[in-house]
Design a protein with these regions (language model features):
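Short, surface-exposed coil-to-beta transition loops
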Residues: 73-80
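Catalytic Cys-His active-site segments of thiol-dependent hydrolases/isopeptidases
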Residues: 91-98
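N-terminal secretory signal peptides
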Residues: 9-65, 138
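N-terminal signal peptide c-region/cleavage motif recognized by signal peptidases
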Residues: 4-7
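Short beta-strand segments that buttress and anchor functional surface loops
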Residues: 65-71, 94
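A short, structured loop/turn motif at beta-sheet edges
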Residues: 56-59, 83-89
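C-terminal partner/receptor-binding element of secreted or periplasmic proteins
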Residues: 11-29, 99-138
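Acidic/His-rich structured neighborhood in mature extracellular/periplasmic domains
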Residues: 66, 88-90, 110-111
């Protein structure tokens, strides 16, 4: 690997699923998913297709927010997660949408939600806002 290639690799943003595997984040993630029923393996492990997380300020607090989706099925199975600034807590919502034409055309009307990490109403509002900002969410 050349020096320029190494520099480029070092500056590549970490995806949400990669972040979940890092020390500090992984322990918090395991606490969130522990005891959750009907949680698919990709969601339980925090592995899947994802983008780099972003810092979001909500109600005066900073959170690292990202999304992860089931590989090869992102439109129907995805989740948004929010880590506290100190990495001591994570909340999430897993969204499942039936694989039918009407559900894919109007996902908000057919979505099933699974809340993770016992989010309060304010955290649910923040995670819901993330879902609603998804392209084609109607």
């Amino acid at each position: 690997m050349s020096l320029s290639t190494a520099s480029l690799a070092a500056s590549k943003p970490v995806s949400t699923s990669e972040l979940v595997q890092q020390s500090g984040y992984q322990q918090t993630w395991q606490k969130m998913v522990k005891g959750q029923k009907n949680l698919p393996v990709w969601a339980r492990k925090g592995s899947g297709t994802s983008t780099p997380p972003e810092w979001v300020t909500w109600q005066g607090k900073k959170y690292q927010v990202g999304n992860i989706c089931k590989p090869h099925d992102c439109a129907n199975n995805f989740m948004y997660v929010a880590f506290s600034n100190d990495k001591k807590q994570v909340w999430g919502v897993r969204v499942e949408i039936a694989d039918t034409p009407d559900a894919l055309d109007h996902p908000s009307k057919h979505a099933k939600y699974q809340w993770l990490g016992k989010p309060d109403s304010q955290m649910k509002a923040m995670l819901t806002k993330q879902i609603e900002s998804t392209p084609d969410w109607n």
